[in-house]
Amino acid sequence: MTATSVPGHLVAPRAIADRLASADEDYIRSHFVPLAEVAGHRLAEVRGAIAAGHLPAPAYVLDDGTEMVAPDHLALPDEAGDALEATLKARFAAAGLDSDEEWRSYLSGAYAICLRTVTPETMIRKTHLVEDIQGLLADARPRDPDWRGALRAAVDELDELERPFAPLDEHRFGARPTRKRLIEDPRERWPWMRS
């Protein structure tokens, strides 16, 4: 009898990997769409712009090579046109962020993985909320009602902005996603965060 055939006992690592991979792909397919579907007749042009560093990369690429993007992947680029980079960098700089670093993050496709909607406002807000929550957690004062209120408000707002993340994102990126570290962990640590 093998470990996979004994109910309630160890499951073979390959079976676990297969389940995780299946759940990962299910998540991606339910939250993202093929780039070809979003780009339509402009697919070659869009792929060229991605390769040239003018448009964000797909959020995910499936094992079969399908490039997956958020349904609104081209909304911001279409709105800004040729001024996309200048517009975003100006907005990032005005918000006190490193415009080159934020532009690189945008082009990597990472913001589409993290955010429900990718706009200059949501990218900037996420960056500021991450900084705020990290600062609050570094100086944890759970008995202080002002600190508790500030943490809860920031965590709740970040929760509204962020997607759930795919099951394998932690392995994909080599780090725990912000949802785990800055939303789920504080809620697990302090019961009052969940009520």
Residue ranges and their predicted role:
Residues 3-4, 15-16, 31, 44:
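N-terminal cysteine/histidine-rich coordination modules
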Residues 26-46:
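Polyanion-binding surface elements
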Residues 12, 21, 33-35:
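N-terminal leader/presequence regions that precede the main folded/catalytic core
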Residues 41-59:
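Charge-enriched amphipathic alpha-helical scaffolds
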Residues 32, 40, 53-54, 96:
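Short, flexible coil/linker elements and helix-boundary hinge sites characteristic
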Residues 2-14, 54-195:
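Long, charge-rich, low-complexity intrinsically disordered regions
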Residues 15-29:
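Positively charged, polyanion-binding regions of nucleic-acid-associated proteins
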